[in-house]
């Protein structure tokens, strides 16, 4: 009787890109082509920046299509100033017409999305791709991670850094699977803000304990050399109305400082 021996299964080995310097990254909100011109002012007004991530790519349909605002002039100017460009891709702009589950659960749409992103990265000489998928849920989470694996392979083959944005770890978002992200991605970025947000209860945007917890919880699953923590350069001023309703206004650091002085508020 012939004995058939099953081949031993071996986990794939994912190599990673790791920078030999501290990454000082800023996201740059770009809503149209004209907004790309702001990069001249952004770099002129910023010190110590190593990396910028413009919001350039938007999931546009359920078949892996993307909308792009990429600019060669933008990339060239950043490179001339020693700043890397990691193009951000998100699922927010067209959230009413796209479905993450449909995009990520089909091999054909995942492959098309990967191909589209890699093509844009090569065409515009991008240094990296930054994933900002904020509407993943338990149903789409496994398919999303499969997409992340497939994208990471193509990024690695083309020398493109892959970073992934994540909420501060909490029970309601554990399905993002940071452990697997920490294996296949080059960097895992904690969005260490929005502890309290517009429409919610008043409170800090990013209290010390909240930020600390986000970092510590992420480090339980992701190698420390891959973790980047993002801090807000804004705060919120909360106003409670007579009827008990609450509203808030986001303010940048300079404006918030002026507001405190104008209202003679003592900080502690």
What are these regions (language model features)?
Residues 17-34, 58-207:
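Chitinase-like catalytic core of GlcNAc-active glycosidases
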Residues 1-51, 80, 164:
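Non-catalytic accessory regions flanking glycosidase/transglycosidase catalytic cores in CAZymes
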Residues 40-46, 175-184, 220:
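Mature extracellular/periplasmic domains of secretome proteins
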Residues 50, 127, 225:
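Short acidic/polar active-site loop segments enriched in Thr and Asp
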Residues 187-190, 196, 212-240:
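Active-site region of glycoside hydrolase catalytic domains
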Residues 168-172, 208-212, 234-240, 248-250:
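Active-site glycine- and acidic-residue-rich loops that bind
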Residues 3-11, 235-268:
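Glycan-binding loop/region signatures in secreted carbohydrate-active enzymes
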Residues 10-11, 35-39, 70-72, 175, ...:
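Short alpha-helical segments and helix-capping/turn motifs at coil-helix boundaries
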């Amino acid at each position: 009787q012939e004995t058939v021996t099953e081949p031993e299964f071996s986990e794939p080995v994912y190599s990673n890109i790791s920078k030999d310097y501290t990454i000082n990254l800023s996201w740059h909100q770009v809503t149209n082509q004209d907004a790309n011109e702001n990069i001249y002012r952004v770099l002129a007004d910023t010190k110590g920046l190593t990396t910028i991530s413009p919001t350039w790519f938007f999931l546009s349909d359920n078949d892996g299509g993307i909308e792009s605002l990429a600019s060669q002039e933008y990339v060239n100017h950043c490179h001339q100033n020693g700043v890397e460009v990691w193009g951000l891709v998100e699922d927010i702009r067209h959230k009413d017409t796209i479905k993450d589950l449909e995009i990520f659960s089909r091999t054909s749409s995942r492959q098309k999305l990967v191909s589209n992103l890699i093509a844009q990265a090569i065409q515009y000489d991008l240094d990296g791709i930054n994933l900002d998928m904020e509407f993943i849920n338990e149903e789409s989470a496994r398919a999303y991670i499969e997409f992340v694996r497939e994208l990471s392979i193509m990024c690695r083959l083309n020398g493109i850094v892959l970073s992934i944005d994540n909420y501060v770890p909490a029970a309601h978002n554990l399905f993002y699977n940071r452990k697997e992200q920490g294996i296949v991605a080059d960097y895992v970025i904690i969005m260490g803000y929005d502890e309290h947000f517009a429409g919610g209860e008043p409170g800090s945007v990013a209290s010390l304990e909240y930020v600390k917890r986000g970092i510590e919880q992420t480090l339980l699953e992701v190698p420390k050399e891959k973790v980047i923590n993002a801090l807000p350069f804004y705060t919120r001023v909360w106003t409670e109305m007579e009827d008990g309703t609450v509203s808030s206004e986001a303010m940048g650091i300079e404006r918030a400082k002026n507001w405190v002085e104008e209202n003679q508020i003592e900080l502690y």
